Amino acid sequence: MYKSTIMSKRITKFTFVGTLACTFMVSSIGLVNADGHGVYGPFPITEKSYNGSKKNSVSYGGQIARQLQHNALKKLASKGNPNDPTNAPEKRMLSYFNIKDKSKTLAILDPSPSSSKFPVKQKMIGDLSGGANLSGKADKRIQTSWPGNMSGVDVIKFMIKKAGKTKGGVDTRNGMNYPQLISKYTMGAVLYHQACDNYLDEKMTASSKPNNKPYKKGAYYTGKEHSWDEAFGYWGAAAHTMKLTAAQSYDIAKKKDLKAADYNNDG
């Protein structure tokens, strides 16, 4: 149920809400020309200096790719094997944490493209964005709640190493559930951090990313347009969230309601 165009049309219907709650949905985002009943655009190009061929000012495929990289980390964290001398589980998790999938080598793991009940059209992370990773956007500041003066990046890598050597990712002796720990911490240190401490913080000031200039040289969207869109992408909600009931949103998050998820009926 994902299609690729400007960045990607169908993507993470996973819903990231705040630092503690995250329900992942597979929904369309407003990036493309489509029969989306007015939800998906195209949204006009308002950046006056742009002379290219783009017709839709919305673009946040990188954020959606990161949502799916987060999902993959959570899934892989349950595959730890203390008897693997090659550290393969850790290495695979690190690939989803570090790699920008320009060469399209990272498969989408959750939701599964091969699912018969809740399929998605894209197969690879790189189908959504070839320039996105998690490690580059994780909080670089010292995490005072952790020993050793670790940054947010260090903490996630530390937990990945532990998960890779823990059977099933759950250390019952020490009370550590690494799929949950890695997921929740990544949501806070990457997704929430970027949305609330970057795009909706510094980039909302008058002197940063002004609305009468391109976000960056050659961009087809203004500074404030793109800052809002990037924050929305990190939140991760479906473009048509406001047309869903609470029950539908919940069922989509549980991958139960494909009809509600596929708002523009393109399969």
Feature locations, PLM:
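Bacterial N-terminal signal peptides
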Residues: V17-S27
